[in-house]
Amino acid sequence: MKSILFILLSVFMAMAFNLQAQNDTLNNYDEKNRKHGTWVKKYSDGQVRYKAEFDHGKPVGTTKRYHENGNLKAVMDFQSSGRVFTELYNKDGDKQAEGFYHERKKDSVWTFYDENGRIVAKDSYTKGKRDGKSLKFFRNGDTSNIVPWTDGKRDGKIRQFFDNGKEKLIGYYSNGKLKGPLTIFYPSGFKKVEGRYKSNLREGKWVYYDEEGDTSKVINYIDGKPENEEQLEREETKEIRELENNQGKFDDPRNMLYERNRRNQRRR
């Protein structure tokens, strides 16, 4: 009887140690119970979740994280300066973004890629907040959108372009609000709309042009309200709607990449 119990206990302990080995491999602590040396964590099926190096509780060297399908998810290079250069990948193994973290916040320039490795956007950060120019690009690499940021708020001259290189829109932000002149163009280069904003509201005379460059309509605004509502309904443009509807929204390139990946998954 004792022999049987001993055998069962041995088998149980072996299974327990095997399970531990699958999920926590080479995981060590120093005398103060801080992570130290090589650490490997695994998913329940034994697939590696991440590999990392620690020096008395502090991550050092290169950390690699993996998706459950085994493809690379992230590579993090911990530098002596305290900054961490990071590369992020989707489940198919395509690089989606790269840039620096400092104190767990995005810092300096981050670059975002599509599934074919083309750059789709670049953002500048300071201590986790957008600070500097935010750029978007067409598939051919030409710039499609320029938005300046200061301390996490849109601030300065914004520009949009057609894929032929001509300007599509010029406007201005001040401390996160639309302020000053706005001009929208046709692909031909002729003006389409001309007006002004004051604290996010349309103000004064707004002029609408036809594709030949002739004035088609003039609407006067007071505190964001047109004198003639029917004229507004007819002359509303897609560019103006997008500009005003995006107020207060944080346009993160990762959202655009996520939607693209989801569409690609549906096609398969």
Would you name each region that the model predicts?
Residues 1-26:
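Bacterial Sec-dependent N-terminal signal peptides
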Residues 17-268:
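Glycine/tyrosine- and acidic-biased, solvent-exposed loop/turn segments at the edges of beta-strands
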